[in-house]
Amino acid sequence: MNVTVEVVGEETSEVAVDDDGTYADLVRAVDLSPHEVTVLVDGRPVPEDQSVEVDRVKVLRLIKGG
């Protein structure tokens, strides 16, 4: 399954995920840590260990270096 991952304020990527892939897998695929982001589906946060069931997500970075 291909999923569009939009990192808010940054870039949007297409990520291939296995049928049993989780939202944490998506986050790692765009070189982020699941501990520094929240994944949003239809504007609502989802658990990182939940299986991916949609084809588009937004990723909100909670920690940003500076």
From Swiss-Prot:
Effect of K64R: Loss of isopeptide linkage of polymeric chains on NcsA
Disruption phenotype annotation: Cells lacking this gene grow similarly to wild-type in the presence of either DMSO or oxygen as the terminal electron acceptor, but are retarded in aerobic growth at 50 degrees Celsius. The lysine tRNAs of the mutant strain appear to be nonthiolated.
Organism: Haloferax volcanii (strain ATCC 29605 / DSM 3757 / JCM 8879 / NBRC 14742 / NCIMB 2012 / VKM B-1768 / DS2) (Halobacterium volcanii)
Keyword field contains Transferase: no
PTM: The C-terminal glycine is likely acyl-adenylated (-COAMP) by UbaA, and also probably thiocarboxylated (-COSH) to function in sulfur transfer.
Lineage: Archaea, Methanobacteriati, Methanobacteriota, Stenosarchaea group, Halobacteria
Impact when changing E53G: Abolishes SAMPylation of substrate proteins
Gene3D superfamilies: 4.10.410.50
Residues modified to 1-thioglycine: G66
Modified residues (Glycyl adenylate): G66
Encoding gene per record: samp2
Protein name in the entry: Small archaeal modifier protein 2
Cysteine pairs bridged by disulfides in the record: none
Recorded superkingdom: Archaea
